[in-house]
Amino acid sequence: MSLATLDATQHPNLPQSSQTLFSAKATKKLTFEQIAQHIGRNEVAAAAIFYGQAKASPEDIEKLSSLLDIPTPVLEEQLGGFPDRGRSVEMPPKEPLIYRLYEIVQNYGYAYKAVLNEKFGDGIMSAISFSTKVEKETDADGNNWAVITLRGKW
């Protein structure tokens, strides 16, 4: 089992809560899937809390406190405010996987826009009323494929 960890030197702009959460995650040897199951969210949403990109509800804070053995007042202080979204990634991104996601939007962004406008009319897809998930598919030849679903209200 591989665990996502945090190298704070690679992410100097993340909030203090990121270090607190990732340190406890590593100590407990928990995956984001396990954390997500415990707090009742999907694993991308759980990871977004760890990176300071999603707001934790009071229920999330209680459940994370219990699961990770972090005192509730510490998490309330660190996660109680509003996230400062978007500050963690420099543009263009240097991390190869993040860059590939950026490249997908760079290469297909206008194509997505054209097709979405044809299907839905003028407008935008919400990133607020939004959900996303990651799944793994294995084809008949044994190759692994990443399936990323983006679901936003129009």
Swiss-Prot record:
It comes from Aspergillus clavatus (strain ATCC 1007 / CBS 513.65 / DSM 816 / NCTC 3887 / NRRL 1 / QM 1276 / 107). Gene3D superfamilies: Cyanate lyase, C-terminal domain, lambda repressor-like DNA-binding domains. It catalyses: cyanate + hydrogencarbonate + 3 H(+) = NH4(+) + 2 CO2. The active site is at 100, 103, 126. This is Cyanate hydratase. GO terms for biological process: cyanate metabolic process. Catalyzes the reaction of cyanate with bicarbonate to produce ammonia and carbon dioxide. Belongs to the cyanase family. Its EC number is 4.2.1.104. It comes from the Eukaryota. The keyword Lyase applies. Keywords: Lyase. The gene is cyn1. The keyword Lyase applies. GO terms for molecular function: cyanate hydratase activity; DNA binding. Pfam families: Cyanate_lyase. It is an enzyme of class 4 (lyase). NCBIfam families: cynS.
